[in-house]
Amino acid sequence: VQTRTPQVAFGISMRTLPGFKGLADLRGRRIGLAQAGSVDAMVTLQLLAQAGIRLEDVSLMELGTSPSAVTALRSGVVDALGHFDPAMMEQRGEVRIIADTRTLKGTIDLFGGLLPSACLYAPIDFVQKHPATCQALTAGIVHALKWLQTAGPGDLIKTVPEHFFQGDRALYLASFMKVRESISPDGLMPADAAQTALRSLLGLYPGMRLEGVALGRSFTNEFARRAKDRFKA
């Protein structure tokens, strides 16, 4: 596990909804997300469900990448946005964040527990046939996760390839600081996180056949635990 939360923020457009008072104001509005079925869609649907807003009460629009999402919000194509990395729009006062799964608290408030997103995964057959490869990959990730727990802005500037900053180092660092606490310290699946994921999927997608899923077989901490012991993460 690399991130313990979805790292998605849901924001209201200050251009089209400057007088926003509550989630009920989203009825009849257009909501942007990266892709249907993705984690940002899951965050958006969970937020709407908690507010008692039905899908037919809003218009969901797939926007793809972050640049497309920013353009859609700025031009008034969408009134709200469930997406990754709104740091630039936050700094400019273009959005008002009302749900934030970049933080542990925000994720627990929305889903009732931690909901890991980024992770290392593979078919069971591959894991069984290539355990050494799986262990090596896991070791690299856990080592990096440990480093990220103490890395300062200067460390990031020296390590991250320049093109990742897209010409704005300060914005990159601000974005990283917003998600920092969600980064796993050791790569282990948090307790009850798999149950939170299953419960959320069953609630949001009642048509999915997940009743017989064996959660204990859906993940393993075996490789991460070895790497944690090795690097004292």
Segments the model singles out, each with a brief description of its role:
Residues L198-A233:
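Conserved C-terminal helix/tail region of periplasmic/extracytoplasmic solute-binding proteins
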Residues S68, R74-H163:
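Pocket-lining segment of extracytoplasmic ligand-binding domains
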Residues Q2-T3, L110-F111, M189-P190:
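Short Gly/Pro-enriched turn/cap motifs at secondary-structure boundaries
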Residues V1-G64, A72-S75, D79-E90, E94-T101, ...:
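Short, glycine-/small- and polar/acidic-enriched structural segments
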Residues R4-P6, T150, A170-A174, E222-A233:
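Amphipathic, soluble alpha/beta structural segments
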Residues Q35, P67-T71, Q166-R169, F219-K228:
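Short, mixed-charge aromatic SLiMs
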Residues V127-R209:
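Secondary-structure end/capping motifs
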Residues K21, A49, R54, Q166-D168, ...:
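Short coil/loop linkers at secondary-structure junctions
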